[in-house]
């Protein structure tokens, strides 16, 4: 066979290269990578929150198990910070005080602990009434602001003015209006003791709080209303649905997530009410409008930081319990995961039904 000089060079040029390995990322690997990047981004914020929020909570809980400054009957020396167990909690819940001789008995009249349960009832009363009224008014205001008409932007700006005013300014404003010679009594044509009569004092605080915070509820509900497609309402009108049917069958179900979040925020805020009753009515712990937060401040003013920490811990537990109920049982979806959880439940139910069918077959 004749030798071809270019055959070798051609064969060498046609030599196949060795294939390189290509890394293929699985969905699990991509998911882990995404979670890792997200954790790295939010880690600084979590560290700051742990310092600013976590440490004070832990410190308050530690102080709540330590005794206040008092005279030790066995040594005759003032002691403070000794481990007291549940003494500070029983001081508030059962109104149990320790005498100078070390005997624990019922607190005498005038001790701030005797105002605990009345303050709890007033706090819960304020929270329930104000949140209910603010939710109703907020829904009405949100529906008005969500309409299509001229001057809608001006109406939205005007509605939010009360919420933008500082709470202290709001309290002084309504205090002047509810004064004996104020504009409210002038309009009513009678003399009502708004700041001294227990019933009217509580009514005054409720009116001021609803006036200030209803726009906040309206703003959150409006955000939910704007997420509802207009096509849904148009289809309902074509089908002959009345305005009430559109509200109950379309608006309320679709706006429920935003509504429950708004109720959650307002309830937690109402349970910590302090400045309105203090500025408008009185800062005394036996005031007809005294809240639990007022007792904390009053106890701290008397130098009882450990028992005040115990009361703060009780407030924290109350707020945590309310938040858990609203999130777990009433559908307040803060993390936006309710839809995913429902989808997982449906998948589990479908898989279980399929397994049952296979077993039956």
Regions from the language model: what does each represent?
Residues 2-33:
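Short, Lys/Arg-rich, polar N-terminal cytosolic tail immediately upstream
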Residues 31-353, 358-361:
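A structural signal for multi-pass alpha-helical bundles of membrane permease subunits
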